[in-house]
Amino acid sequence: MAKKVEKLVKLQIPAGKATPAPPVGPALGQAGINIMGFTKEFNARTADQAGMIIPVVISVYEDKSFTFVTKTPPAAVLLKKAAGVEKGSGEPNKTKVATVTRAQVQEIAETKMPDLNAANIESAMRMIEGTARSMGFTVVD
């Protein structure tokens, strides 16, 4: 018989850098998860994506065992990396902080495709372009 999921915990953790310190430790402790077991497994699974923030969904079962699924990095993080900036604009409609090319947007859309609810790459690109505009980035051809 399948185990019953008791709780879902969603976190965004830097790849390969999960530690028992806040915010990871308290979130997992409340759910009753073995914190060291999770951090070791997460760090091993994400070691190749160093420097990225990885969203993770942890399913906690009634017997306190757990499984987790890592997602693709947030579009905003990928856009900042592609544009080479630290953060987006505080007022995106007035101040533009960077430009990204349509090719970079397509590359990000292809990376994000498994996690987006887009039917094709064009609609995924439009989603990423919208994120870029809301961050104060200009999209050029």
Curated annotation (Swiss-Prot):
Record PTM: One or more lysine residues are methylated.
CDD domains from the UniProt entry: Ribosomal_L11
Residue stretches in coiled coil: none
Record GO biological process: translation
InterPro entries with a match to the protein in the record: Ribosomal_uL11 (IPR000911), Ribosomal_uL11_bac-typ (IPR006519), Ribosomal_uL11_C (IPR020783), Ribosomal_uL11_C_sf (IPR036769), Ribosomal_uL11_CS (IPR020785), Ribosomal_uL11_N (IPR020784), Ribosomal_uL11_N_sf (IPR036796)
Membership in a protein family: Belongs to the universal ribosomal protein uL11 family.
Description of how the protein assembles with itself and partners: Part of the ribosomal stalk of the 50S ribosomal subunit. Interacts with L10 and the large rRNA to form the base of the stalk. L10 forms an elongated spine to which L12 dimers bind in a sequential fashion forming a multimeric L10(L12)X complex.
Name of the molecule in the record: Large ribosomal subunit protein uL11
Top-level taxonomy: Bacteria, Bacillati, Bacillota, Bacilli, Lactobacillales
